[in-house]
Structure formats: structure tokens, C-alpha cells
């Protein structure tokens, strides 16, 4: 190496990992070339985002990340070098948190439809000799990151292998599920058209459900539409006005979209229009698959109206599927993000008496199920998006505490939740829904994380 290279003046720390992949090396390399690859590989427990990129994986191309270092945000600029198309590339830090950093990605065939990915990270901690004391912690952190990346890469490649590329429109692309779904689809070779409420740019279509506005021209010839848009249920206390906004954001937007798709000269083959397991209401210990009747209460009424609003598309001959989403597990948002602070500080525990059933799903299985519905012609109507093994809230708390290595014995009293949240406490936190994914099982979906513990360990790097 040149004498100006920090790696030539100090012995770097080295972390390596090798994993078998279910596709040829060229296919694994191509996955990394596509938009969304880095977003898919950033661990969700890290506060990091892609700010800028140029030139793909070619020598000299660059990527800039924004990363959190305690209370400070840093720019991490990396340049690609030593690229051999189909076989390898290296990221080299130009500016960032380490004194030096290189990351070699190598892909080698291991059979007609198999390969191996080998990652080798070399780094020198910051702050000179004083920083060396942190080397064991940094090595463990890098190893966690590589394990997450390899598991995500392996499972994404398996999900996309043999699937023809589609043009897929997505609403709610900036939400918790949508922001994970879009890079997953793009790295699989699909073309994603985002439906946005601001002035549309390339690859975007304008719509504004509150005004009944939608530009249908950009949807002509689309293969599939995945409709996720809707006001956040946990965005505020459920006043009469708030409940009306929750209903309107779902029913009006869905009806506008369904009617617009029905009028197209070349409509999509499928509309995947979101729903939620709240449609089942508070059902105690009853095991609920898709054949179960809907329940009572605000969320059940909302779910029925939400699904019914897609009728114009169904009546026009478009295949319509309704993913009834469970509690989606990701540290980037939703219930898990709110629970992490109290659980990490040892103040977590069951909600109420903890006997209510929580039906959860990892963020990767949530987006995997949506993709499965898009490419599975036999799947229509409602399908539950929950892990195969629901558990009580008390067991959820114990599991999260075990994963974080913290006690989970401090209960949250039901009366305190009701005082703070009103009706939402009973409907969203204290209600019991023991839901299982019957349709996903019968149509061949394979869960990455069939248990809540597996899901939590993946998304938290534990």
C-alpha cells in the first residue's frame, strides 16, 4: 500500500464472515449494483441513512452516509475500488468516524445455482492509541453488522430468485413498511413507482386523496399496486375528529385509487390494499385465521370499511388482496421503537395484566408477504401478516427482556394507559387478537422469522 495509507502504518483490526447464498455469484453481485442495496444492508438498530451516491460500484464511485455518533451526526464518505464486475468490490473510507476503514466484498460460485459471499473488514479505531481500547467493542459491532447483512442478503436473494421483474406502484412509500419495501423491491430487479403528494419527480406519480386528485396516466401498464398509505393510528388521542381523519385517510384514499385503477385501459393485475388485524376486535384466546368473522369496535369497523373501499378494483376484474398487518417489529418505528427505551433501562414489562395476545411480525416478513402477494396469482382476499406463533403480551415482554438481557417485570397499569390514551389503550394495547397466517402458509410463503424471538434478534442484532 502507499506510505500515505493509514493501513500501512498501523496494524488494522480484521473482521471476516463467509455465507452460502442460493444463487450464482453474478446474481448476488447484481443485487448489490441495484438501487436500494445499501438501504437494505444498513442495520435497523443503527441511526444511519444514505445521503448521496454516484456511479454504482465502479472504481471511483462514492457513497455518503449520515451516521450518529452519540449526540453528533457525522458524514461517512466511502469510495469504491478494486471492482471486478460479477466478482468483487471494495469500500474505502475517505472521511468518517474511523482512522481507516476498508471493506472487501467477494462473490464466488459454489455450484450451478449457489455461491458464497466473503466479507473482510479492516479498520483502525479513531483517537490513536487511546482508541485501541475500544477495539473489542468495535469488532463485536462490525461482526453484528456483517451477520445482519449476510442474513438479509441470503433471504432477499431467495425471495427474488426466479421472479420476473415487475413495475410496482407503492403508496405510503415513506412510512415504516413502505420505506423498507421499496429498496427490497428495487434490489430484486423490480421498477418501483412511488405515489407522492408533492410535485412528482422521475419515477413518481402525483396523488392527493384529501383532494380526490390522482394522475392516472402514470399508472397505465403498471403490473401491481401496493397501497399502504393511511394516517398513523398511534399519532394522537382518538378524539371524534381524529377518528374521522383515520377513517377518511384509509377509505377515501383506497376508493380513489380503486376507482382510478378500474378506469385504466391497461389496469394492473393486482391491487394489494392494506388492512390490519384490528378488524378481528378483542377476541380473547380464540385462534383467528382468515375465515374468522370480523369483530366489534372502532378498529373492526374501520377495517371493514377500509377493505370494502377497494371494491371498484375488484369489480373491474383486478385481483385484490388485503394484508391484515399485525404488530410490525422494527426499531425504526412502531410499537417496538417505543418500547426499547424503557426495556433497555430495565423499566419494561407487561402491559395491563399481560394476558392479551399480541400477533407480531418482523419488518422483513411484512415486506416479504407483500411481495409474495404481488407475485402469487392464487392469493386474493384477506390474508393475515403475522408470525405463525402468536404470544401473550406478558410473553412478549419476557422475550424482549431476554433478547436485551434486561429484566422485564415492571408492568404498565391498564388504568394509566386509559388515562393517557383513552379508547386507543383498550383497542390497540389491551385488546387480545390471537391471529395466525393461514393463507400465507397455504400459498407457500416461507417465514424468515417464525417466532417473535427470532424477529427481535434479527432487527436488534442480538
Protein language model regions, located:
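Glycine/proline-rich active-site loop of Rossmann-fold NAD(P)-dependent oxidoreductases
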Residues: 316-318, 329-338, 373-383
